[in-house]
């Protein structure tokens, strides 16, 4: 609904199929007019014949190179075929399907079903997040969004500094806090990006010189996991594992909302764990809004 509003598309009726009770709670809080119908697998889509637009995306874990690599045999991936079933029953004028980059074989199968070639859009054009996704749609004249030049410094809290223009991914996963063993294993691979300003008594007027950065990919990981922090890359300091633990923090739910170009506090009211999950499973709103603007042309 946020994307439709930003695209200037008037909505008379919005029906959602969602089984995650926390995602439903967020939807009801922000848009009480949404009709929630629960499990898509039991839906009789003929009820909605004549609706103008169907938009959706099956869980990315089933298609992605990451995760368990279960592809089309994964029950989560089979939700794609529910999308196909919905289109056949409803026969909307327009559709939009989102999914992750995947093997060419799987991409080609989806393309064959959808009847249109996908467009690859990186969220970093409209946000501070690196998030490449494929979009299959018959909405006309979809081009790449203009780069808004949004940097990580634009979304992080005032207690942090960043150091790159466009970053590698950081995963905002469901679950646990950072621990010593995690840093021992991965600290050399994580790109150093944020330092809390209250470390060593604050920076005062002599803040370290930093190079400002695009961020992170927010994504969820099945079965829990860690939320890697953004870490300083100050050449004047060589951090030990314990020192890294002292000067790092998680990306906050508010920052994740901004990375997904949602309104501040959109997921407020849930636990942080559930906020991370909802945000990781969601879309970058301004990418969707960019595509939906084609409905008005």
Predicted regions and their residues:
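Conserved SAM-binding strand-loop segment of SAM-dependent methyltransferases
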Residues: 32-39
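Conserved SAM-binding loop of SAM-dependent methyltransferases across substrates and taxa
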Residues: 1-9
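Class I S-adenosyl-L-methionine
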Residues: 43-53, 60-225, 231-241, 247-249
